[in-house]
Amino acid sequence: DDGGYAVADHRTIRTDLGTMDDLADLTATLHAHGISLVMDLIVNHVAAEHEWARRARAGQQKYRDYFHILSTQDEVDAWEKNLPDVFPDFAHGNFTWDDDCQGWVWATFNEFQWDLNWANPDVFCEFLDLMCVLANRGVEVFRLDAIAFIWKKLGTNCQNLPEIHDITQSLRQAIRIVAPAVAFMADAIVGPDDLTGYFGRGRHWGKVCDMIYHNSLMVQLWSALATRDVSLMETALSRTPDKPSTTTWATYARCHDDIGWTVDDADARETGLDPVAHRQFLSDFYSGTFPGSFARGLVFQDNPVTGDRRISGSLASLAGLESALESDDPAGVDAAIARIVMLHTAILGYGGVPLIWMGDEVGMLNDDWQRDPGHADDNRWVHRPMMNWSMVKQAHAEPHSVPGRIWNGVRRAINARHRSPEFHASVDTVVLPSPHRKVIMWGRPHPEGRMIELYNISEHEVWFPMETLRSELDDVVTELL
């Protein structure tokens, strides 16, 4: 079921987890503790077992129109000409033949996930009604999964098309009439040029999504760690357009998914890098095949046509902790812990809503995902483990243990953020020119004071010129960490 992303019924809960009434009880308990529930809403597709798909197979035209069903191979070929493969290893192509429908059904991700036809107003109304139902159960944030794929236009790659923002703004306006506290979070893991469109540009400014994953920040952090050079990161983040003051980033270093190297070609060339070669280097480095690499990752979806090779792996294993522990290398362990803490401090320090993937705060390593036959064909499960609560207990009881050192480092950064008004979401982060290629520097200008942050992405001590800081700071300086 693609890890839960093939939804057969939007209005019921998986029976082993509970009921819709249990969901309402959960959200009430969370609200009482100041926690908002974020729910994935998979807007691009439904499971082939969904009632809409079953009715389409039964020949009901109303529901056939919920999907993109093509009659001939020539039609398929015309669309496929411009469409990339998302999962080339196990789901080649974007269409699947269905005998009952007697047609080719659009299925971007897997043959069991049928893409919805958002040009059909009935699909829009179905999802608006669903949002109202779930909001009445206490859901406050909808993570719009695969939002970048929902509009189809012949002759394009059918990603990031402008009609997406028309649809999203319309959904947002409608849901806020009945549930004004609801927020939208865009799952748009796209290139830097397309990313901020999901906040809204032009007439959509500030009227689309309230939060977006800062995919570019995540990619640039890992790129800088591999190269020990912040030049590309400085260039890429400096070009990030301003966002509406009513929106914010969701910052992260790892999540449930693979890492795709969305490095802009122009950014790479400006810093003297060949973009194709650099993406290949990053895949080699984080899969552990590059000489001297500290990482233990896995290649996910090797596409020989495009050269795209994404990476799976837990944050700690990608940051070098697994290899250092296995080789009994204390210095390597120290360096890996420093990387892990730095990554978390950076996502906390950039502003926005930091997302910490479960287990990363104590340094959980790659999971033995192949033991589960249902996961063996998808190595993304290497970073989707069951929580290791014994590591949490160790982190609290033994501050000098590896989990304890990581946890205390992350907690120190969290506490510093809590004390600092400069992290208000309306404040933009400004990347500043750094005189040292191993140190990224950014600032957060706030009416109560200007914050400057420095991140050393190398294993080595760096001497940083004090005059650079004096030119950016006020007379009275406070160190937060």
Task: Describe the residue ranges of each PLM region.
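Active-site and adjacent substrate-binding regions of carbohydrate-active enzymes
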Residues: 1-481
